[in-house]
């Protein structure tokens, strides 16, 4: 016995919300929806809603709006090893989170810890601090800052034209090209944790 709750409305809201937003920006929302590659990132507990109900609803409206091509399914998000529970007050409210941290911190952390499978994921505040401070800020942010600062101080903010490549340059280009291909493969396979 499955319960429908508000799933009929929810599926239609994906479409109507997207279309309303795009049309408020002067774009043809229906065309945008139907021309896009559609992903529905869902939790493992609502698989049947997306694979059965969503499909049936779209077919019932004569396929006027295309179905998602991909439905990556993830595990549950835990907080400090326990299941989120709004009724017990064991959750992180998005508004409260965003008062303390930039949205990019949440995007980075969740992408970094979420594998492309249905195993549960644990949001741990200590791990969040380590990954944000040591990876995002100290490694990625510092690298970008140093590269841009160097370019600004040595070349007035303009990357100079190269004169010729030596063997070391060619080796670096080969390594960067291979790394780019690996990252693209991970991203195309929704393995954002590995891409990072």
Summary of predicted features, one role per range:
Residues 1-153, 189, 194-195:
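Structured secondary-structure scaffolds
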Residues 126, 158-184:
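Acidic, turn-prone loop/beta-hairpin segments
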